[in-house]
């Protein structure tokens, strides 16, 4: 992989890139050509295809992954690619984490932490349920480890879903362990499963958009259905084990205003909803602060301005 931020004038390019834009244009000489914007997780670079009859030019569109051969040149002090040949790439030629913002945490280490949480659950039925998702269903687990946590709002990057899930579970477990009348196994199981239907609600990269069932039903109800189906298939759950876990899934957004069909009516459900909300809000604040530093849009005191998702104006602490 030749990452864009490492390219230099004179480099020969042979690599796969994500096509952000594709358009046809006419030069001052009257010659027609194609403009493409190539991207990976490190940045973007413009490409020029001067041979409009070049093989493969009609085989791809914006949003596709394309294998590009060409020369990196400098034009008006900006690097660009003079494309010689290109073709649509096959799925086994690229990894999405090379092209989109990715969790700063190692995926393998996050997987280990996930399985440690699963192993910590003592309730036999809850452990069977977690194993059914995260051990026995290899395709589900593979997707879960790389899926984004949201389309835009928070953790909207490769492996954002597992990063958010682990953070929520850590918070929820610590809160639950502070009280002797809260069922820690129920809290951990619900926290690990609360957002599993994000896999169905939002399409994976590069599309990163709401699916039809994501728009019409949403991940809360879809998640309820996924967990209920596994519970019924495994069998042997008591009514209390089943109903209380499903309630935690349905109520994890904390209020009907934010999409939960039920308010938290168990201490365990309240813990999960608060942990979920806390991690989401803190991530929104962290991402907003980082972005405003890049764009230099903070005010003189470091405040970022009112944020509709966080619900307030805020700044980073000046204490070090």
Provide a role label for each language-model segment.
Residues 17, 63, 168, 249, ...:
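Divalent metal-coordination and catalytic microenvironments
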Residues 80-146, 222:
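Extended, charge-rich, solvent-exposed interface segments
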Residues 268-320:
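Acidic, carboxylate-rich catalytic segments that either coordinate divalent cations
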Residues 152-154, 163-164, 174-291:
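Divalent metal-dependent catalytic cores for phosphoryl transfer on phosphate-bearing substrates
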Residues 35-40, 204:
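Short, acidic/hydrophobic/Gly-rich beta-strand patch recurrent on exposed beta strands
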Residues 1-13:
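OB-fold nucleic-acid-binding modules
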Residues 127-171, 193-199:
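A short mid-domain helix/strand-loop element embedded in enzyme catalytic domains
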